[in-house]
A protein has these predicted regions:
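Catalytic-core regions of hydrolytic enzymes
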Residues: 24-153, 168-180
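Bacterial N-terminal signal peptides that target proteins for export
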Residues: 1-10
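N-terminal signal peptide c-region/cleavage motif recognized by signal peptidases
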Residues: 18-20
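Active-site-adjacent mobile loop/cap segments within catalytic or ligand-binding domains
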Residues: 31, 42, 106, 160-211
């Protein structure tokens, strides 16, 4: 498991949103979503927990972003608490933000899996992408009445994962464009292996009304 340097992530984020900021008079609003939290630990590796790394990175990045007069930051969580996936989407939508960025850190004993990648909501039948989505979506089983709330969604079903991807099609083009810029910036500013832009069906994105 490897955490991102907050300054590196900040510079990448600035590079990706600078054009949008200059094109509007109001503040550019960024939702920072620290993945997992509370009873949902996320990935673990040699004592490190994804939920803590994601939160620490998001808080550091958010603090620096907040020092800029033309950027407003909204957090889905700013402490170690469990936030349901739909609630994360509701926070983002109510804020009427420009972009939604969810921070996650994977862990794998296979060192060839190292690097950074950016996911957007999309229809895919790629086995590895589906497995990533299934792993992240499995958090819904920690929520009460998730079968009703998510309308019969089965986190272990490829058909369910593919089905929810259709709901985000409106923002797909902008999401892919932003994701490509993120990957390009990481390639220029870090030595991380570029694992590219990928698509999969993530429940946290299904109701998001922004890239």
């Amino acid at each position: 498991m490897k955490s991102l340097n907050s300054k590196t992530f900040l510079s990448v984020l600035f590079l990706c949103i600078s054009i949008s900021i200059t094109a509007q008079n109001t503040k550019f609003k960024v939702v920072l979503d620290a993945g997992h939290g509370g009873k949902d630990i996320g990935a673990t590796y040699h004592g490190y927990a994804e939920k803590k790394i994601a939160l620490n990175t998001v808080l550091k990045v958010g603090k620096i972003l907040e020092s800029e007069h033309d950027i407003e930051v909204v957090y889905t969580r700013n402490k170690d608490v469990f936030v349901e996936l739909d609630d994360r989407a509701n926070i983002a939508n109510k804020s009427k933000a420009n972009i939604f960025v969810s921070m996650h850190c994977n862990a794998n004993a296979n060192t060839s899996a190292a690097g950074n990648e950016t996911y957007v909501m999309g229809i895919t039948r790629n086995a590895s992408n589906l497995e990533v989505a299934k792993k992240e979506n499995s958090v819904v089983t920690l929520e009460d009445n998730y079968e009703i709330k998510y309308e019969g969604f089965d986190p272990n079903s490829p058909e369910s994962v593919i089905g929810i991807s259709i709901l985000q099609e409106e923002y797909r083009e902008l999401s892919v464009e932003l994701a490509a810029k993120v990957q390009q910036a990481f390639t220029k500013k870090t030595t991380f292996r570029n694992r590219g832009v990928k698509e999969a069906g993530f429940l946290v994105l299904r109701k998001i009304t922004m890239p």
